[in-house]
């Protein structure tokens, strides 16, 4: 699709002051931001944390993670999708496909191309098909609306229960259709209704069987036929007639034929029953509701519940406003609030699903979720603990009611610790919360024998615990040994934080000591770029001898390697709870700064061509904090320089506007923090100070609290901090604490300039796991 044509759809006609809560901030949201070039964002229609994400499914021969691709053929329009994920697709179920003319075989290839660029705006999606059909979409929390305009002639809608997003990567992660049923009824007022269910398994998280129920209506009279395929995957039809129902492990569905060129369908979903699916659509999209009214409902929900949480009167730069509000939008597409729709257990606790993934989101996304959505955040914490109660482990990732996978540590521990140290109490049972964390820290999860890594569990928990507990390091008998070790250390620091808060001194001492065990992977003899000492692998031989390692290479960087998806030099900066020790091991502050500077030097990496071959990778979460670590060495100006350069170079309000996979909003959350001028250290109350993008920002913290940030002398070439006042008091530290500006609200008043200034002469940021920190 032509990028400029796609982008222009969301450009606002004008820019007004954003100081009013009544301002339609949705005008600045580009649902298409990040939906191309590997960002994998979902450009369809959804509510914040909504179950339904109604959008197109396209086939290109490669994986369509959100259903959408900018090229290829439409194969359906489905109610369930993810956003910003990778690995393999999930969902793409409860689908309809409009077809003109006569449908002789509904299981044949019905795919069709675009006739023009899709139209997107918050709350609305439109596709123009090359066969003359126009598809317009709207959504509520548990239901969706399809509005079709057909050319003259017979008009059909095909409902294929077996429809699901496929995977083409050859890793055994493709979703499978396991069977389903469909029944067609005519209501008392003459409206056509269909309902049924489909069951599926596998997908990105290797899930067992799960079932979704559906209930759909059409606003026009229709003739119908149900169909039955020969098997679960083929195109051979063995039944295609006016039977009112089909139920089989083979492909089933129905074709509805209309005499009208305008047809509207309302479809609800549930994970409990078809009856509940009907109740959901009847409640949320009642008969007679118009698409434009539904669009306004969606816009209002996003405006009032999400976008208005950050406001500004600095409206001179539309690009910055689009980046701000598009990032807020995509950052909160998932997780999904499935409270009331959990088929596995009954509980008074909330239930959240579609957690992609804590190893990506714990650094910057979940801390931002806490600030902007405190009620949702508390519910989310309660849901994680409840999953542990009923399933034995908290998830590091979860979808379709099933934990899986875990790439590194048990990073739900970090999320819980972050909530605890920042005062989340409410209805959270913290004794159970700590017990869930203890399970991660002490119980070896059963090996799920993942062919990508058969050495230990990739489903949940910490599969390499035997080494970690016995040796204080992880040997190469376990895959991803080094990247696991640095994350396990952070996880144990999380336990220390909660244990300390619960006055469990024995546990606190134990896990603080264990959190320092990342040091056992610091190989003082590894050298690169004239620096010595990096995180390295250790063999399973007695004594854990060092294994030779190039600090600038992670080999395959995949499930079976010592480092997952990041270089040794990147992971060597990731002891964020113990940075003072890291600075010392690196040779002191000057050497530490020199190491950081090397990360941003073009041409030092054989990879990362899109980033100038730098070792720093803005599209990869282990690099997220790296630009801000200068604050620990007295060079806050370089934190501003490097983080601002990355943000402005690699983010844009366009389909290719992300530096990599969105990772369920992790990328967008990194940008949002940079725009605010802070960076969180998860599991601590510390926020590193950078430089804000707007002359003023007001962050609504809930409960009448707000953080107000101002920036005097801000310009495109004037963004270095000259001075800072916090709550009206001159400030000389390159960090603030939760209690300073978030717990009760506060103010941060920056004075900026075009050149660095030595303003941050006070205490360095805390390093709580360091003996001298």
Annotate each PLM feature.
Residues 491-492:
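TPR repeat positional signature
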Residues 707-715:
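Short aromatic-glycine motifs in intrinsically disordered, low-complexity regions
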Residues 691-694, 716-721:
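Short coil-to-beta strand junction motifs in C2/discoidin
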């Amino acid at each position: 699709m032509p990028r400029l044509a796609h982008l222009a759809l969301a450009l606002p006609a004008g820019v007004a002051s954003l100081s009013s809560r009544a301002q339609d901030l949705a005008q600045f949201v580009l649902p298409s931001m990040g939906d191309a070039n590997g960002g994998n964002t979902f450009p369809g229609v959804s509510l914040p944390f909504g179950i339904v994400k109604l959008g197109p499914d396209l086939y290109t021969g490669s994986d369509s993670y959100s259903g959408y691709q900018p090229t290829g053929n439409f194969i359906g329009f489905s109610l369930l999708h993810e956003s910003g994920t990778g690995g393999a697709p999930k969902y793409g179920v409860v689908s309809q496909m409009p077809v003109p003319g006569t449908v002789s075989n509904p299981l044949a290839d019905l795919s069709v191309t675009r006739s023009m660029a899709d139209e997107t705006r918050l709350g609305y999606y439109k596709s123009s098909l090359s066969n003359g059909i126009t598809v317009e979409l709207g959504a509520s929390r548990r239901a969706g609306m399809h509005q079709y305009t057909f050319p003259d002639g017979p008009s059909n809608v095909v409902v294929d229960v077996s429809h699901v997003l496929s995977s083409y990567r050859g890793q055994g992660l493709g979703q499978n259709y396991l069977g389903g049923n469909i029944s067609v009824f005519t209501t008392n007022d003459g409206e056509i209704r269909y309902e049924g269910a489909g069951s599926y398994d596998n997908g990105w998280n290797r899930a067992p069987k799960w079932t979704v129920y559906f209930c759909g209506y059409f606003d026009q009279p229709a003739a119908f036929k149900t169909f039955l395929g020969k098997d679960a995957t083929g195109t051979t039809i063995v039944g295609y007639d006016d039977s009112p129902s089909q139920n089989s492990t083979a492909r089933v569905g129905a074709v509805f034929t209309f005499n009208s060129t305008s047809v509207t369908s309302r479809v609800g979903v549930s994970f409990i029953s078809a009856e509940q699916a009907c109740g959901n659509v009847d409640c949320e999209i009642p008969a007679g509701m118009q698409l434009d009214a539904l669009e306004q409902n969606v816009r209002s929900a996003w405006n009032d519940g999400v976008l208005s949480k950050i406001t500004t009167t600095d409206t001179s730069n539309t690009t910055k406003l689009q980046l701000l509000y598009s990032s807020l939008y995509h950052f909160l597409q998932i997780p999904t609030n499935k409270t009331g729709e959990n088929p596995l257990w009954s509980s008074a606790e909330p239930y959240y699903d579609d957690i992609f993934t804590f190893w990506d989101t714990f650094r910057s996304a979940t801390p931002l979720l806490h600030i902007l959505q405190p009620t949702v955040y508390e519910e989310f914490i309660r849901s994680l603990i409840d999953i542990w109660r009923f399933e034995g482990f908290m998830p590091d990732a979860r979808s379709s009611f099933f934990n899986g996978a875990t790439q590194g540590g048990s990073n739900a521990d970090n999320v819980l610790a972050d909530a605890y140290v920042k005062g989340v109490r409410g209805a959270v049972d913290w004794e159970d919360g700590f017990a869930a964390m203890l399970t991660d820290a002490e119980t070896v999860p059963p090996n799920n024998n993942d062919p990508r890594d058969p050495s230990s569990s990739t489903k949940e928990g910490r599969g390499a615990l035997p080494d970690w507990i016995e040796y204080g390091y992880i040997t190469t008998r376990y895959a991803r040994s080094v990247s696991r070790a640095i994350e396990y250390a952070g996880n144990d620091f999380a336990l220390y934080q909660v244990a300390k808060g619960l006055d469990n001194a024995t546990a606190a001492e134990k896990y603080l000591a264990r959190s320092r065990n990342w040091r056992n992977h610091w190989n003082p003899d590894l050298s690169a770029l004239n620096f010595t000492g990096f995180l390295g692998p250790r063999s399973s031989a007695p004594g854990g001898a060092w294994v030779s390692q190039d600090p600038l290479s992670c080999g395959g960087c995949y499930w079976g390697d010592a480092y997952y998806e990041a270089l040794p030099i990147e992971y060597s900066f990731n002891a964020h709870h113990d940075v003072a020790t890291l600075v010392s091991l690196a040779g002191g502050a000057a050497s530490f700064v020199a190491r950081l500077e090397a990360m941003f030097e073009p041409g030092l990496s054989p990879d990362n061509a899109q980033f100038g071959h730098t070792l720093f990778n803005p599209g990869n979460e282990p690099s997220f904090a790296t630009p801000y670590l200068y604050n620990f060495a007295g060079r806050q100006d370089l934190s501003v320089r490097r983080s601002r350069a990355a943000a402005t170079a690699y983010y844009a309000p366009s389909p290719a506007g992300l530096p990599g996979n969105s990772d369920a909003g992790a990328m967008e959350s990194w940008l949002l923090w940079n725009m605010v001028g802070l960076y969180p250290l998860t599991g601590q109350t510390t926020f590193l100070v950078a430089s804000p993008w707007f002359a003023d920002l007001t962050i609504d913290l809930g409960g009448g609290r707000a953080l107000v940030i101002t920036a005097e002398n801000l310009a495109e070439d004037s963004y270095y901090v000259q001075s800072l006042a916090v709550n009206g008091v001159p400030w000389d530290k390159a960090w603030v604490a939760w209690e300073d500006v978030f717990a009760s609200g506060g103010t941060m008043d920056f004075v900026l300039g075009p050149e660095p200034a030595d303003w941050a002469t006070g205490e360095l940021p805390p390093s709580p796991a360091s003996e001298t920190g």
